[in-house]
């Protein structure tokens, strides 16, 4: 639920359907933050790694936004490629620090998504996602306005920078809370929002609930497949999501390049958004 909604908000704020926590350096930043917390304060509670993960993931996401706002080539594929390159740089730094401090085994569980470590006393931090999702619903109209551009937001009396940073903070907090508990799960924040947008348009008020529900069903399905394929052993959910997500991601890129800018927004609501505003 959290990853799907984070992806939907990031896509709206960045005005690009291929932006998500995995392609926007948010997840890799959270992983680096967790590693730093485990090295600096090794015997701390789950709140400390979550706090470190939030700060570093927010900085990584802001760096990503900084880069994409200053490049001239802003094609639908170029923006996520920049995010992927930035994510790989951060991941390389994470692996280097882990190797330097002999923490490779410790950080490995956070680099791969799995529900195996979800036990009592560890998963409770995910509850922080609930008020953040509620806040996302409250600010949905503001995110819609910011997604239309800085000048449009200014004309409607919305502080563009404040709403943009607030939206990125929500996405970073959600991502950090999830990565601390289950590790990295890619593609959920990328694929699920695009599917919903293709079916219902990109107005956040009408897509947040559907995105959350489809994200939950998708993750649950992948988890069941991971438990059934090689019973009695279990495949990590990140592996199953990665395989299915990679295929869907390539299909979306091809579809976008073939049909143009309206390919992923077949039912875009134009007049309704202006009326609501």
Regions found by a protein language model. Give the residues of each.
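Alpha-helical transmembrane segments in inner-membrane proteins
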Residues: 1-277
């Amino acid at each position: 639920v959290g990853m799907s909604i984070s992806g939907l908000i990031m896509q709206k704020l960045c005005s690009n359907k291929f932006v998500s926590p995995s392609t926007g350096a948010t997840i890799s930043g959270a992983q680096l933050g967790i590693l730093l917390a485990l090295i600096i304060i090794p015997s701390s509670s789950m709140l400390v790694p979550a706090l470190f993960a939030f700060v570093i993931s927010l900085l990584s996401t802001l760096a990503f936004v900084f880069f994409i706002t200053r490049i001239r080539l802003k094609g639908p594929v170029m923006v996520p490629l920049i995010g992927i390159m930035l994510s790989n740089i951060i991941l390389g730094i994470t692996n280097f620090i882990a190797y330097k401090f002999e923490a490779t085994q410790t950080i490995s569980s956070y680099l791969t998504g799995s529900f195996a470590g979800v036990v009592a006393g560890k998963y409770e931090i995910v509850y922080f996602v609930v008020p953040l999702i509620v806040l996302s619903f409250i600010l949905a109209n503001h995110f819609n306005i910011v997604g239309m551009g800085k000048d449009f937001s200014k004309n409607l009396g919305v502080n563009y920078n404040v709403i943009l940073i607030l939206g990125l903070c929500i996405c970073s907090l959600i991502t950090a809370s999830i990565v601390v508990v289950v590790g990295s799960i890619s593609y959920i924040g990328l694929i699920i929002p695009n599917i919903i947008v293709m079916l219902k348009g990109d107005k956040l008020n009408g897509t947040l609930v559907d995105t959350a529900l489809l994200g939950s069903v998708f993750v649950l399905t992948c988890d069941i497949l991971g438990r059934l394929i090689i019973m009695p052993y279990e495949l990590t959910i990140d592996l199953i999501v990665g395989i299915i997500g990679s295929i869907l991601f390539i299909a979306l890129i091809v579809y976008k390049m073939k049909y143009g800018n309206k390919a992923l927004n077949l039912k875009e609501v134009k007049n309704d958004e202006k009326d609501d505003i």
